[in-house]
Amino acid sequence: MKDNGKKAGITVLVVEPLKEPYVKTISSGLKSLQAEVGGNIEEIFPFDDASAVILNGDGKLKGLMPNRGLYDCEGRLCDVIAGTFLVLGTAGEDFCSLSKEQIAEYMERYKVPERFSYRNGAVRVIPVPAGGNTKTGKHMGKSPAGATTQDRKAGKGYRADGVR
């Protein structure tokens, strides 16, 4: 990442734990990116398009709240991002605004907040319905991994890849 002093505004997607993502215009400078994620930044490139994820590089070590999962092309959980992160566009070594298409794609991808549970050696992903209530089964239906609320209450857990 270059930090050549430019302070041009870029349009990014902000993804906070337990919240739906939102679009925000921020400075592309290092200090601005650090302020958004709450610390030292790390950039990763988990997608096939010209975009990047900026996250707090020390988020897990600092015990920041788990936020969203990163999944492989087959839908298996690969990693969990801790703390607030940004999705932004890339142009060579510089960061830039997301396109309208990218905004729509990543808004949909990260629309449903997630909680995570570690049980029996497996990380489980629990979608959080609108309003953040994970206690009741209302409005939850089936999770992406196939577990219903009734299954979870009965102790029938599912891993992120859908295996019981």
Which residues fall in each region the model found?
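Short, surface-exposed polybasic-aromatic patches that bind anionic ligands, especially phosphate groups
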Residues: I41
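Catalytic phosphate/metal-binding cores of nucleic-acid and nucleotide-processing enzymes, i.e., regions
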Residues: F45
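Non-Sec secretion/translocation targeting segments of pathogen effectors
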Residues: K135-R164
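Short, surface-exposed beta-strand/turn modules with glycine/proline-rich turns
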Residues: M1-S32
